[in-house]
């Protein structure tokens, strides 16, 4: 009746508290300025206000604007539909977003009137998420980037109304979608990227970081280890302090005068296990395939097999051995010199085409004298000499 209406209006006038929506609950304390304004809303505490239909604001200066949103704590803000803000000075602005802890912000006002931070969550302290479907667990993490401006908006009614600083995206673009940061003071300004560690930075899409003080500036790159750095697309840095460099193609090499073409001549990127001055060995590598088309890594035992065969050298054998020799054969290793001595050292006193070398097709070369000798100046056999002047006995 009129008595109830007057009493209700008197409560609003005296306490700056109200229950304006249907099926709403307003519970006030000694310093209440609490308002459950939307339909089916609940506001409990001091300076708390529930605007969104089915929303709940509990605590001190908590504000819920989103439909079915919940804000519990001190200075919580739940603006997104089905959003949750739980803690102290936390904001859940995106639809179905969650902000739990202390001084977290999830989402922004977009230029078109929508909100970023959809289905994102921050748990911990001083985390900021601009992107959609992004997650931050820890402290001081930042996911996403945007060109923003800050305005001031009054919230609430009566003398207890407060003012919120509203961060608005001015260019309509937000990075940091579907990304995640777990740790302390990590920064991600890219989509589909993840960081686990502390003080690491990712500024390229599709990147992965596991470590502290790491940096990734190239797409689809991976950094594993502390103080790693990846600046090349699709590259991988493994181990503390590792840094990547641009991949270098090696199509062929000339060995002993012969050109050998290689497989895998168009590398997509590179894997680094150190940096200049801090190189590492790679151990426990399985034997790779050996062929003209193989791109497998080769381990030390395979190289040993090659060098051990080369160390065997080449064996040379004669029909007989010299009186001072122990055998009629000897072995020379790769790079060692073999001397073949005929006796005559003046090339002008040598003939041509009087000796032939015949192979048996397996392992023997036979040196034979021509049946018809040409280009000779003289032939001496014992005391007999044949030359251009005739026969001398």
Which role fits each region the language model picked out?
Residues 121, 271, 282, 303, ...:
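Low-complexity, small-hydrophobic/phenylalanine-enriched stretches
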Residues 1-284, 301-304:
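Glycine- and small/polar-enriched repetitive beta-structure motifs of secreted/surface proteins
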Residues 5, 9, 13, 361-366, ...:
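Low-complexity, glycine- and small/polar-enriched segments
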Residues 6-15, 111-115, 287-300, 322-339:
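Short, polar loop/linker segments at the starts of domains and inter-domain junctions
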Residues 267, 275-305, 351, 359-363, ...:
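Extracellular repetitive beta-rich solenoid segments
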């Amino acid at each position: 009746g009129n008595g109830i209406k007057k009493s209700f209006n008197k409560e609003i006038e005296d306490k700056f508290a109200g229950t304006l929506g249907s099926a709403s609950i307003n519970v006030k304390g000694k310093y209440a300025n609490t308002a459950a304004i939307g339909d089916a809303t609940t506001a409990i505490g001091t300076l708390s206000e529930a605007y969104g239909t089915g929303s709940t604001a509990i605590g001190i200066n908590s504000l819920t604007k989103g439909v079915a949103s919940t804000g519990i704590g001190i200075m919580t803000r739940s603006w997104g539909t089905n959003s949750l803000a739980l803690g102290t000075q936390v904001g859940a602005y995106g639809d179905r977003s969650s902000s739990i802890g202390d001084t977290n912000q999830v989402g922004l006002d977009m230029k078109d009137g929508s909100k970023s931070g959809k289905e994102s969550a921050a748990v911990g302290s001083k985390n900021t998420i601009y992107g959609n479907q992004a997650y931050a667990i820890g402290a001081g993490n930042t996911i996403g980037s945007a060109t923003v401006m800050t305005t001031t908006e009054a919230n609430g009614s009566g003398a207890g109304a407060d003012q919120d600083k509203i961060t608005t995206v001015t260019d309509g673009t937000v990075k940091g979608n579907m990304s995640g940061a777990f740790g302390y003071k990590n920064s991600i300004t890219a989509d589909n990227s993840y960081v686990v560690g502390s003080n690491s930075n990712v500024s390229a899409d599709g990147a992965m970081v596991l470590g502290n003080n790491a940096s990734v500036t190239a797409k689809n790159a991976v950094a594993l280890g502390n103080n790693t750095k990846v600046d090349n697309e699709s590259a991988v840095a493994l181990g503390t302090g590792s840094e990547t460099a641009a991949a270098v193609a090696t199509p062929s090499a000339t060995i002993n005068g012969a050109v050998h073409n290689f497989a895998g001549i168009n590398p997509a990127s590179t894997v680094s296990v150190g940096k200049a001055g801090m190189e590492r060995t790679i151990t426990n590598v399985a034997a790779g395939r050996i062929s003209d088309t193989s791109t497998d890594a080769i381990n030390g035992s395979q190289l040993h097999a090659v060098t051990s065969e080369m160390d065997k050298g080449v064996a040379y054998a004669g029909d007989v051995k010299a009186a001072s020799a122990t055998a009629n054969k000897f072995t020379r290793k790769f790079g060692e010199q073999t001397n073949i001595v005929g006796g005559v050292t003046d090339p002008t006193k040598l003939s041509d085409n009087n000796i032939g070398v015949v192979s048996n097709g397996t392992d023997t070369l036979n040196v034979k004298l021509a049946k018809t000798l040409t280009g000779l100046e003289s032939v001496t056999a014992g005391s007999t000499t044949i030359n251009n002047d005739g026969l001398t006995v």
